[in-house]
């Protein structure tokens, strides 16, 4: 499957799962009309467009992602949103970096992809206005459902998939955040949302799209899929529902401190 198809597949699945969790989290982050926001790791832009709606025409959202195919899909999908721009970028290279440009930097399920988190926090700090804040939603461990899916549906690729992730404990994230100069406003765990898939093909597509194509859908035989769904889903037939109960992800909101950072 091509990278463009992967990006489109990501758009189709993220429109539900990640947007649902992201919207819930944004109630705490509280973007305001007129805000300038950086959406760091925007994917195909579903939450970016929602942020643009929240800040209104007097505000602006700059959305960046290192995956150019996802950026192209985002640009084509949200052409009518005039206060939103999509650009290729990363945690170490984004518009306005180091220039105190943004009121909020939003980062939704991106932290586990970034090896150098200390650099990320320093870059975010220097890119916020004096009254700015960051709003991060992240996983500090491999979610249980994902771990089962990778090991049972794609055992041939499990090591490659694990090596893609750079999880950090919540306490470790908080420590790096404070070291960069932030004051933590809120840091808490949230129950992971349930996952529902219309059929087996949507399960294959979901894990393929969310691993940048490393998860191979062609290795998911009907026997593997049936066994997986029988073990973990609720009910006997499609749509397949997998409960998030007992699993969690983390959220962090932190404000730019007026105090100087020693050694910063």
Language-model features, listed with the residues they occupy:
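Conserved class I S-adenosyl-L-methionine
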Residues: 1-35, 46-50, 69-73, 77, 135-157, ...
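Class I SAM-dependent methyltransferase SAM/SAH-binding core
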Residues: 38-40, 44-94
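A short acidic, Gly/Pro-enriched loop at the edge of an enzyme's catalytic core
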Residues: 96-105
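A short SAM/SAH-binding and catalytic strip from SAM-dependent methyltransferases
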Residues: 104-116
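A short glycine-rich, Lys/Arg-flanked "PGG" loop and its adjoining helix->strand segment in the class I
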Residues: 118-133
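Conserved Class I S-adenosyl-L-methionine
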Residues: 166-264
